[in-house]
């Protein structure tokens, strides 16, 4: 019977164990929080880059010439990128396959470079969207 109460005495003397657990577990929880924030920012920026490339391609493919298509693509992609998180650099480009005429394809590419929260390193996300040119005018 006396041995049984000795084990309870051991449990009562564990007053400092919570602070030790806190010291060892808190950095792990902090790491998980920072990792989650980094993953969220990467996925959110990827979604915004895809939305911007979609808007750029959608408005570019209905323009009658390449110059107007580039202007409209930049205008609407930048409008979509206003909703993105803080970024260091953005690049919007149109790649035409086979000249600006009806039936050919245009690819809108958007890349965003932004800092990660945990490490501070720059991370680049690139998305593209390809569409058929609908309103291109043939010369001649």
Each PLM stretch: what is its role?
Residues 38, 97-99, 118:
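Residues embedded in well-ordered secondary-structure elements
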Residues 55-111, 139-140:
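Short amphipathic secondary-structure patches
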